[in-house]
Amino acid sequence: MKYLAAYLLLVQGGNAAPSAADIKAVVESVGAEVDEARINELLSSLEGKGSLEEIIAEGQKKFATVPTGGASSAAAGAAGAAAGGDAAEEEKEEEAKEESDDDMGFGLFD
């Protein structure tokens, strides 16, 4: 991810085709370790893909087809909230019992 971020920074900075050395320099400038094999893998995967805008647009199309599962997570959230409410009531009862046990007629400053 850090190599992709460095690539994007270089492109936004005006370098239309960043090299491995350019990416390495950006990553090293922040004190991060560099894996040149990963940089070369990134550059080879981006080679021939077109402009950065085209790559982002293609990725957005792919994400649009992925189901998010929002309905199932909403149902799980509601069930969790109901269970959480019961736990809160039990906790209040336990606190009340503990408070009555602590007060045995002894005052702190007596």
From Swiss-Prot:
Record field: compositional bias (Low complexity): 69-86
**Residues that bear Phosphoserine:** S29, S100
An example Gene Ontology CC term for this record = fungal-type vacuole
Tagged with keyword Amino-acid biosynthesis: no
- Pfam family for this entry, one: Ribosomal_60s
Alphabetized GO MF terms: molecular function inhibitor activity; protein kinase activator activity; structural constituent of ribosome
**Keywords per UniProt:** Cytoplasm, Isopeptide bond, Phosphoprotein, Ribonucleoprotein, Ribosomal protein, Ubl conjugation
Major location, coarse class? cytoplasm
For the cross-link Glycyl lysine isopeptide (Lys-Gly) (interchain with G-Cter in ubiquitin), the position is K49
Q: List the biased-composition ranges (Acidic residues).
A: 87-104
Location within or outside the cell = Cytoplasm
**Gene Ontology BP term (one):** cytoplasmic translational elongation
| Stretches for region Disordered | 66-110
Q: What does this protein do?
A: Component of the ribosome, a large ribonucleoprotein complex responsible for the synthesis of proteins in the cell. The small ribosomal subunit (SSU) binds messenger RNAs (mRNAs) and translates the encoded message by selecting cognate aminoacyl-transfer RNA (tRNA) molecules. The large subunit (LSU) contains the ribosomal catalytic site termed the peptidyl transferase center (PTC), which catalyzes the formation of peptide bonds, thereby polymerizing the amino acids delivered by tRNAs into a polypeptide chain.
Member of which family? Belongs to the eukaryotic ribosomal protein P1/P2 family.
User: Tell me, how does this one assemble?
Assistant: Component of the large ribosomal subunit (LSU). Mature yeast ribosomes consist of a small (40S) and a large (60S) subunit. The 40S small subunit contains 1 molecule of ribosomal RNA (18S rRNA) and 33 different proteins (encoded by 57 genes). The large 60S subunit contains 3 rRNA molecules (25S, 5.8S and 5S rRNA) and 46 different proteins (encoded by 81 genes). The 5 acidic ribosomal P-proteins form the stalk structure of the 60S subunit. They are organized as a pentameric complex in which uL10/P0 interacts with 2 heterodimers, P1A-P2B and P1B-P2A.
| Name of the protein | Large ribosomal subunit protein P2B
Q: Which organism is it from?
A: Saccharomyces cerevisiae (strain ATCC 204508 / S288c) (Baker's yeast)
Gene encoding this polypeptide?
RPP2B
